[in-house]
Amino acid sequence: MSAIEKLFPTSPQERSFQMKARRDAGTAAPNWVPPQFVECKKCGRRATRQVWVKSQYVCPNCGVHLAIGAYYRLSTVLDHGTFKELNPDIAPNDVLHFPDYQEKLAAASVKTGLKEAAVTAIGRIGGVQAVVAVLDSRFFMGSMSTAVGEKITRAIEYAADKHLPLIIFSASGGARMQEGIFSLMQMAKTSAALERFNRSGGLYISVLTHPTTGGVTASFASLGDITLAEPGALIGFAGPRVIEQTIEIGRASCR
């Protein structure tokens, strides 16, 4: 243990959280080596990962917000040392025995270090205690499964029970097709929980990040008392590709 760690001891959960945040940011790599340079997907600017971490993955050239991992986002939002994860053991369930779903879940978990696309936590922001939920687009495109719906619902209910403000960072491609109707049911489940939270006088801040679409947009992402969004984020019910395939018109024809 270093001299600094002796002066400012941290809990095992906090150390685990910081390790996960560094992994998400690309500054710690236990099993893989991240690229030395990261390129902005909008303007093409290339910079070292350290430069991007300092700017919290906001392009200094064009201002676009790059996607970031759930634990890294929580580390940038919550006061140091106040993170406590809620319901970390909730994991997806292959209720329909969908072909290759278990294998894809395992691969996504290895790639991201996550059990599911949502991470929920309690912590302080500027000294104010709050419940924060983050969807991570790296895990099944942040799609809403029964496990994601359960974690979001429990976070809402925890905020209501403790009379705490609630903040949800959304990033999703919609409902998870591998779970069929069970995934779609989460739209009503989370919306009903938010209605009860609203009636109890709770404050809900919804933050829409790129992209937020489908069933998440049609449920809890659109129900905030205050709604914020990243500049240039894709927000809608259907993405461009789905619209193009439905009406059989390319993007170029619409301009």
Annotated model-derived regions:
Residues 119-198, 205:
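Cleft-lining beta-strand/loop regions that shape enzyme active-site pockets
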Residues 46-47, 65-66:
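Cys/His-rich microdomains that often coordinate metals
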Residues 68-142:
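Long, charge-rich boundary regions
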Residues 170-255:
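Conserved catalytic cores of soluble enzyme domains
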Residues 30-33:
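N-terminal targeting/trafficking signals and adjacent low-complexity tails
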Residues 40-43, 59-62:
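Short cysteine-rich clusters marking metal-coordination/redox-active sites
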Residues 37, 56:
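Residues immediately within or flanking Cys/His clusters that coordinate Zn2+
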Residues 1-28:
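N-terminal alpha-helical interaction blocks
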